[in-house]
Amino acid sequence: MDRVADALERLRIISSERFRPTMELAWPRIVTGFAIMSKQTADLAMVGMAVGIAGTGGMAFALAYWEIVTMLGLGLAGGTVSLVSQNYGGEETERASLVVTQSVLLATAIALPLVATFLLFSEPLIAVFDSDPALVEHGSTYLVYVAPAVLFELLNLIASRTYTGVGDTFTEMVARAGGAVLNVVLSAVFIFAFDMGVAGAGLGTTLSTGFVTVVLAWGMVGRSYGRLGMEPSPVPITRSGPWLDLGLAKQLVEISAPEIGRRLAQGITVFPLLWIAAAFGPVVVTAVEVGRRVRSLINSINWGLGLAASSLVGQQLGADDEDEAGAYGTEIVRLSVVIYVAAASVVVVFAEPIAGLFVSGPEEVVQAAAFVAVGAISAVGFGLDGTAAGALLGAGDTRLPFVASLVGRYVFALPAAALGFVTPLDVAGLYLAFLLETYVPGGINYWLFRRGRWKAVSRKYRPSAESG
């Protein structure tokens, strides 16, 4: 690690004294992100082997709705990590604990209607994309079985971001990685041993996600994990209360709402993209989803570096050190781009064998490999976007990143995808959309960070603002 730190410092990417705390926070989150993203990726591959294109196509449609759940949770948890890190960094632990309590209550209020919607309206939700009976059957079945996991996943995201905000990414890594392994094992048993198909994938996800909730809840109420090496939360949820602080709740909503909007703008884009892909047939639908899943695995790097940027920038601002906060943000962005370029290069080289893990026919492999390669290249834009937006989030500056997300995805990416209908671009319009949806918001958010307006925004959220 020391040699790597020294080499990166000589290359003027990141100083060694900032690299160490960054990676101490980031590497467990990267493992966590990879574990979380690998669940649906492994499920998609197993369904492809057991059921075929109809199964993967229907599951692709269902996973679009699951992505909305994830984006809602990430947006809300973005407000959590921003306020927890600033208050914890300013030694206001009781106030940070109250942020967590209110985040849990809000997450539950959001989750319950979504659970009911998945259970009651699964078939109409899938039919939005395609009326093919086989696709609708497989997609709606997955939604029904995965519905209870909606509540579990939102609570898990709040717990994970709480641990990140206080500088502990090891505890959530152990819980999340254990849940991911359990998910793969359960899904494999249900899909292959019990011949449950997509239902087995959904059931495996629900049971494993619930397991993670139980594990994290133990520490979130301040209980010790014994000799496991995991730590109880230093800002625990308590029964004694208080349960509500209107001023703090307003700040949580104020920071989270634009971040939820930014995340939803990112997640909702997949709906018209899949609708356009459906016009080219189930092979293209599956190829798009394979490309997105592989890109999401690469983007697990952002789970670590993006959250490290939020936490470290937030903690430095909580201590009223704006210069150090700026230095952390700038250098983490540079580090992210370097790592993403390296990871994307490897995936592009091995795009065809990677595609072969999900599909088997020659035409299917060629199409999926193209989307795997394009997805890998577009992931570099995610690296820029995630760390720049993460640094802004640590300061509580979430409104303009939300606008950047809208512009990139709805002004650039979707029109590019639609060009396939009216020009000879055909499927290449979807390739272009993959690239624009990450590089445009990434470039805008990096420019916003370089402007420095976020420093002024952060001053009204710091503990010193309350006492002042």
Predicted regions and their residues:
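N-terminal transmembrane alpha-helices
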Residues: 13-50, 64-79, 83, 108-115, ...
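Short runs within selected transmembrane alpha-helices of multi-pass transporters and secretion channels
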Residues: 70, 74, 141, 145-164, ...
